Amino acid sequence: MLIKNKKSRKGSHMNEKVLTVVVPSYNVEAYLADTLKSFIHPDIMGDVEVLIVNDESTDSTEEIGRSFEVRYPQTFRVITKKNGGHGSTINRGIQEAAGRYFKVVDGDDWVDTENFRKLVKMLKRLDVDVVGNNYTWVDHETKLPTKRQERPFEGFEYGRIYRLEDVA
């Protein structure tokens, strides 16, 4: 799911990022490079901000994030903070988010790059408050899907655009 960023600058969409992805990260060196690679598509690099929020990892999580920050400075940024748990990393990312929308993707998860590209292109055209999406659980060792979750929000008609006041 992604949500509209209410602190985003209204009316100044020229240089604004469309989407901020907050990547909470704590000791995810085994997965982080795959996570970050999944956001890379030349059609959308200027539209996406990826904030890797390092929760004081003790492995090479920060170094992996910094390597993406150096290679793609217009898209990736590492924020290192005192260890405070998963929720505190999300909160810090939201505080720093510059995109019109934000989404959380944990440091041991990834997105389908082509579907992500389509999502970002769609967000450039629409003005919505919340977007829900399907997801699949994948076994990290075998890389095989274990469960696909379609229509994760019960009670909503899919294929419609809802305003935030309709769902909250």
Task: Report residues per predicted region.
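Nucleotide-sugar donor-binding/catalytic module of glycosyltransferases
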Residues: 4-168
